[in-house]
Amino acid sequence: MNLKPESYILRIGHRPERDQRVTTHVGLSSRALGASGMYLAADDAKVADSITDVATRFGGTFFCENNVKWKSCINQFKKSGGKVVHLTMYGLRLQDVIADIRKEEKVMIVVGAEKVPGDLYELADYNVAVANQPHSEISALALCLDHLYEGKELDLAFPDAELEVLPTKIGKTTIKHEHDQEKP
């Protein structure tokens, strides 16, 4: 299933000394809920490697690019025809703008950690709020992706998974897949 529009996440303001867990969860939530990849505007190879490892083990084509320059990343994305959605509690209500965002070909969803630079508000095509209240950036991202894809992301398949989780009423059931590896 190919979800439209394509979505990419830009994580800005990540502080390696204190944000590893939250940023990792931003990446994992993005992957599970249909985003194609994440750009990390900080140098934290450990976080990027952790997200990439999960994507490899659980399938799909999600990527995590480490140490991007956030403003250049946004400008290149916009130059390629993409639109930028900045999640902020000060933006327009998600429910009022999501129909317009769905019409775009591809979107970059910007998720901040600390106070974001003021010029981000100007660079964004959409400044979007989930509830216009302070809360978790992970919950804002999850709700944004769910509204963007109208629940279709919950039925995604993740090809080439090494490990697959099966829905079960009680307990835990997984399948370990053996993939043929090409030898050099």
UniProtKB/Swiss-Prot annotation:
Q: What InterPro entries does the record tag this protein with?
A: Alpha/beta_knot_MTases, tRNA_m1G_MTases_N, tRNA_mtfrase_aTrm56
Could you tell me what this protein does? Specifically catalyzes the AdoMet-dependent 2'-O-ribose methylation of cytidine at position 56 in tRNAs.
Cited Pfam families: Trm56
Key words of the record: Cytoplasm, Methyltransferase, S-adenosyl-L-methionine, Transferase, tRNA processing
Q: What does the similarity note say?
A: Belongs to the aTrm56 family.
Domain of life the protein comes from: Archaea
Give me the residues that bind S-adenosyl-L-methionine, please: L87, G112, A113, E114, K115, V116, V130, A131, N132, Q133, P134, H135, S136, E137
Entry EC number(s): 2.1.1.206
Instruction: Return the GO cellular component terms, semicolon-separated.
Output: cytoplasm
Catalytic function, reaction form: cytidine(56) in tRNA + S-adenosyl-L-methionine = 2'-O-methylcytidine(56) in tRNA + S-adenosyl-L-homocysteine + H(+)
Organism equals Methanocorpusculum labreanum (strain ATCC 43576 / DSM 4855 / Z)
Q: What is this protein called?
A: tRNA (cytidine(56)-2'-O)-methyltransferase
Alphabetical GO biological process terms: tRNA nucleoside ribose methylation
Q: Name one GO molecular function term.
A: tRNA (cytidine(56)-2'-O)-methyltransferase activity
Where found, per UniProt? Cytoplasm
Subunit record text = Homodimer.
